[in-house]
Swiss-Prot record:
Monomer. PANTHER family: SHIKIMATE KINASE, SHIKIMATE KINASE 1, CHLOROPLASTIC. ATP binds at residues 14-19, 120, 156. Belongs to the shikimate kinase family. It is an enzyme of class 2 (transferase). SUPFAM superfamilies: P-loop containing nucleoside triphosphate hydrolases (SSF52540). GO terms for molecular function: ATP binding; magnesium ion binding; shikimate kinase activity. GO terms for biological process: amino acid biosynthetic process; aromatic amino acid family biosynthetic process; chorismate biosynthetic process. This is Shikimate kinase. It comes from Pseudoalteromonas atlantica (strain T6c / ATCC BAA-1087).
Amino acid sequence: MAEKRNIFLIGPMGAGKSTIGRHLADELHLEFYDSDQEIEKRTGADIAWIFDLEGEEGFRAREETVINDLTDKQGIVLATGGGSVVSKAVRNRLSARGIVVYLQTTIDKQVARTQRDKRRPLLQKDDPETVLRRLAEERNPMYEDAADYIVDTDEQSARAVANQIIEKINQ
């Protein structure tokens, strides 16, 4: 039997990785995983609490372990955390073990999509837009470098983006 392909979704918070990933997995009959949800499941704690207790460095170490474990599976769609690409080891692992799709979005869309979400520790500041701009400057080159495909998520439904990804990977 042919080996099933893995699809890994990367991009900033608010790009739609989890929502699009569920649609993609459903359409392709693959298992869906969200690295943040998997971390919460394994630790029994939410991301914000892990950040408070262990700092970003402790969280990133957990994230790297979870992504390593999940990318060893076959036939999955994985929505990664927005900061996972900061780790060169994670970027290399994603590239080596599947198809990497960068879900691109604007800062304005990120602000609109994340403004009521209290589960995002990096945005619990007075000026989340400034934080998002700084993160974009830092991470966008890493997303681009790791990506096999880049898909814009701003003006399309999650289902339309999932279908666009399927078209791209089947070309």
